[in-house]
Amino acid sequence: MKKLIVSFALMVITLASYAQVYKMYSTRNYHNQLRLNTMTGEVQQIQDDGQSWIICSAREISGDKESRFCLYETQNMWTFIMLDTYTGKNWQVQFSVKGEDYMFAAPINIFSLAYPEATSNWTNRFQMFATQNMWTFILLDSYNGRLWQVQYSTQDLDNLFCIPINKDELGSDNEKCIFSIQPLTSMYQYYLINDRTCLLYTSPSPRD
């Protein structure tokens, strides 16, 4: 009986660990889901008949931080944006039912916007927010208030970019999220909020 209890406990621990490393994302095609390795950034398309394909190979092969990578759904049903929440790097990830030639991961921003150390244990440092322009997201460094406009495209992969909106740090030496974004009534503006001081900053929207 004791052996059975120990075996069951080990199984529960293993499943919990798996759930923390791997995250499943539903898609608007009910036959397919995406499985993300949140440590490495590997993305697999999982079909309900048991078939699977690697859409995006590991971006951080030696990654050991759970929840470092995440996926953001776009208004295009076949496209997600993958974000490295430690560095701000991001990729356009596309799944498909037409075959592997239509599955890919294309880099949008390949440059590190922050430089974690081996001991860094950041949580949701970089975050993305959808805008009313379906092709555009706002990328926020929630530790210091820096902002970028991120654009994806399903027609022209040369039209992917990540450009700064606000390069200036509005806070420093923070090891947790203190900035957040809230939309204004105007579709062209938003509030950047310092949750520690309650200061509000307004900014124009991303370009059309």
Sequence positions of predicted segments:
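Cleaved targeting-peptide boundary
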Residues: 20-25
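Trp- and S/T/G-rich repeat-edge/linker motifs of beta-rich repeat architectures
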Residues: 49-64, 99-120, 157-174
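N-terminal targeting signals for Sec/Tat export/insertion, comprising classic cleavable signal peptides
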Residues: 26-50
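Positively charged n-region of N-terminal signal peptides that target proteins for export
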Residues: 1-4
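Short beta-strand motif characteristic of blades in beta-propeller domains
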Residues: 31-38, 79-85, 135-142, 189-197
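Conserved small/polar residues in nucleotide/adenosyl-binding loops
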Residues: 201-208
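Structural signature of eukaryotic scaffold interfaces centered on beta-propeller domains
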Residues: 183-184
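Hydrophobic h-region of N-terminal signal peptides that target proteins for export
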Residues: 11-18
